[in-house]
């Protein structure tokens, strides 16, 4: 790959808008060479990066009403860990996919790019929580 960014603009992901389609339009207008997929935390806690990556993880519990997320270490961890690793070792990537409920901005961007990939795009930027 012969990509030389040369000070091209990109973003961190979070945008202060509620509508996923509006977010995608703003991103493609202002970050045309290195667009991000939008996270829209003003829509609610599940749009936050920690919440998005907690979905499907063993022993992670959450309560949207109180905006809390935690690890439940009580009881036998084995069944949830087995289920998690069965999917992992089977290569079942769909099990680990972001859901439309937790990441509508991601799906809005994917759908827009599938319908018409702008020629200005050099790289797509994603985000992970580590």
Where are these regions (language model features)?
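Active-site-proximal loop/short-helix segments
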Residues: 125-130
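Alpha/beta catalytic barrel-like cores
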Residues: 1-124
């Amino acid at each position: 790959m012969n990509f030389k960014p040369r000070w091209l603009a990109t973003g961190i992901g979070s945008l202060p808008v509620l509508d996923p389609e509006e977010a995608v339009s703003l991103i493609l207008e202002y970050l045309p060479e290195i667009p991000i997929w939008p996270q829209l935390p003003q829509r609610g806690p599940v749009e936050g990066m920690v919440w998005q990556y907690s979905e499907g993880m063993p022993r992670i519990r959450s309560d949207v009403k109180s905006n809390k997320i935690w690890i439940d270490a009580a009881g036998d961890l084995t069944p949830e860990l087995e289920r998690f690793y069965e999917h992992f070792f089977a290569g079942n990537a769909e099990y680990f996919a972001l859901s439309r409920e937790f990441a509508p901005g991601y799906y809005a961007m994917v759908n827009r790019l599938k319908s018409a990939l702008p020629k200005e795009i050099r790289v797509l930027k994603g985000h992970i929580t580590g």
